[in-house]
């Protein structure tokens, strides 16, 4: 099964390496704001800068579109948070995430 969020106006970005796609994500522009979402990197490509390249590609696209504010939501303390911070994002707030198993 293939599942992909179908967000109106979403710009999908992919990073190639090693003969195929290794990372992908979206930039959703709306009213001057850009939302970075759905980041994914193949496990075999992790730790080699793929997500950073993905973030930088969307930053360039956002600048071309004239967006004035960019947002992303990531798990606190993880690799994605560190990558976004290195690319110039700052933490605006933290929020609780809840999980439950279905039995």
Regions found by a protein language model. Give the residues of each.
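Conserved beta-strand-loop-alpha-helix junction that forms the acyl-donor binding cleft
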Residues: 71-81, 99-102
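Non-catalytic surface loops within mature trypsin-like serine protease
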Residues: 17, 43, 76, 102-103
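A conserved beta-strand-loop-helix scaffold within acyl/acetyltransferase catalytic domains
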Residues: 1-44, 93
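Conserved acetyl-CoA-binding loop-helix of GNAT-fold acetyltransferases
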Residues: 38-41, 47-64, 82, 86
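Conserved acetyl-CoA-binding loop of GNAT-fold acetyltransferases
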Residues: 85-94
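Residues that form or flank phosphate/diphosphate-binding pockets in enzymes
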Residues: 49, 79, 93
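Conserved GNAT acetyl-CoA-binding A-motif
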Residues: 62-74
């Amino acid at each position: 099964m293939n599942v992909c969020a179908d967000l109106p106006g979403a710009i999908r970005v992919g990073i190639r390496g090693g003969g195929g796609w290794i990372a992908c994500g979206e930039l959703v522009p709306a009213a001057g704001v850009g939302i970075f979402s759905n980041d994914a990197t193949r496990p075999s490509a992790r730790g080699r800068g793929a997500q950073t390249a993905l973030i930088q590609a969307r930053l360039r696209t956002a600048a071309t579109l004239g967006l004035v504010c960019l947002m992303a939501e990531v798990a606190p303390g993880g690799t994605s948070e560190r990558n976004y911070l290195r690319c110039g994002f700052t933490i605006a707030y933290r929020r609780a995430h809840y999980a439950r198993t279905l039995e």
